[in-house]
Amino acid sequence: MQHFLPDSESAFEEHPWNWHTPLESKALIIGTFPSALKNRKYNFFYPNPANFFWRIMSEVSDIPLLHFNGEKAVEERKEILSKLKLAVTDIGKTIVRYNGSSLDEKLEVQEFMDIFKILEENSTIEKIIFTSSSGKSSAVSWFLRYLTEKGIHHRFPKGNKPIRSEFIFNERKILLAILYSPSPRAANRITFEKLVEIYRNEILF
C-alpha cells in the first residue's frame, strides 16, 4: 500500500508480507524492505531478479530455480526456505521511499517489524542473519535502533564479514551474523562462489 506524501518524490509504504516462518525454522534472515514495485517479479521476499539472494539459496538448498515470476516462483522459493528451515522478514514495517528507488539509502524507516514477536512465536529460531550492514539505512542499523527501542543496547564487533555476535532474548541466546549483501552493487567485493560458501556456513549451522 502506498500513500503519496505532499512531496511527489516520496511515498509511504507498508510491508506487503510481514514475514514467512517455515515449521521449525532454525535461522531468521532479515533484510531492509522489498524493492520498488516496478522491480518486483512476484509477491514475496527478494522479488527483484537482479538480487542474488535466491540464486544463493538455490545453491545452498540444491533446489534449482525454475520459475521467475508469478505464484509458481513464490511456491518454489517457499520450498527452498522450508528445506533450509529458514525464516525471512525485513526490519522495515513501514517506510518512506524516495524517488521510487530500490536503494536502501533512499528508504527512511517509520516503523520496525516486530522481530521479538517472530522470536516468541518461533522458539526454534537460534540465529538471526543480516543481509545488509552499510550506512544508516541497513538491516543492521535499523535492527540496532529496534533493540534500543526495546531497551537493549547492543554493539557488533568490528572486523571482516561474517561478523558474529549474540544477545539474550527471554533467556534464549540468539546468535547474530552479518553477511555480505546479495545485491549486485555489493557483489563486486566478493565472488558468487564465496557468497554461497558464507551463506551456506551460516544457514546450515
Model-derived regions, located:
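C-terminal capping/extension of enzyme domains
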Residues: M1-N18, L23-E24, L37-R40, P47-P49, ...
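Short, surface-exposed acidic-centric catalytic microdomains
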Residues: K38-L107
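Internal catalytic-core helix/loop-beta-alpha segment
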Residues: K83-Y146
